[in-house]
Amino acid sequence: MAKLHDYYKDEVVKQLMSQFGYDSVMQVPRVEKITLNMGVGEAIADKKLLDNAAADLAAISGQKPFITKARKSVAGFKIRQGYPIGCKVTLRGERMWEFFERLITIAVPRIRDFRGLSAKSFDGRGNYSMGVREQIIFPEIDYDKVDRVRGLDITITTTAKSDDEGRALLAAFKFPFRK
């Protein structure tokens, strides 16, 4: 079991129960899933780019990504409905906790010119979204085998009812928010 999951059960639950005055342990917000999304717009011209992006995402997450397709045709972007334009992975359970631990302890500190993550990226329901400009911050990616530096979106979905609860949950995990 991931250390972060044990830390959540032992420390974070107690801390949040006292902070928000919950009656039951089940009221305490928890991390439900983490979604990684990589939009590869250049895949329209070269299908190989999407395969490389999917391989990178599989290495980062430890799970085979789902290829996302365009929902509707957009002439300005030269895409048609059904074209493969990205890939995504939804992590839950053990893999989610392991990825979350790697994200906080290894990947985020490796971001160039890192000054902390924005605390304003909550969606109003306690879910947090962040963008990563380079996939090479993850140790699973071999820098020499990267064909192109691409970014990805990371969404942390929680059971929190408000942004304050979600922020307190992530802060309890020592999430590096900007001061």
UniProtKB/Swiss-Prot annotation:
Keywords annotated in UniProt: Ribonucleoprotein, Ribosomal protein, RNA-binding, rRNA-binding, tRNA-binding
Gene3D superfamilies linked to this entry: 3.30.1440.10
GO cellular component, one term: cytosolic large ribosomal subunit
An example Gene Ontology biological process: translation
GO function term, MF aspect, one: RNA binding
Top-level taxon of origin: Bacteria
Pfam families assigned to the protein according to its UniProt record, in alphabetical order: Ribosomal_L5, Ribosomal_L5_C
Subunit: Part of the 50S ribosomal subunit; part of the 5S rRNA/L5/L18/L25 subcomplex. Contacts the 5S rRNA and the P site tRNA. Forms a bridge to the 30S subunit in the 70S ribosome.
Function: This is one of the proteins that bind and probably mediate the attachment of the 5S RNA into the large ribosomal subunit, where it forms part of the central protuberance. In the 70S ribosome it contacts protein S13 of the 30S subunit (bridge B1b), connecting the 2 subunits; this bridge is implicated in subunit movement. Contacts the P site tRNA; the 5S rRNA and some of its associated proteins might help stabilize positioning of ribosome-bound tRNAs.
Family: Belongs to the universal ribosomal protein uL5 family.
HAMAP family with a match to the protein in the record: Ribosomal_uL5_B
Name of the featured protein: Large ribosomal subunit protein uL5
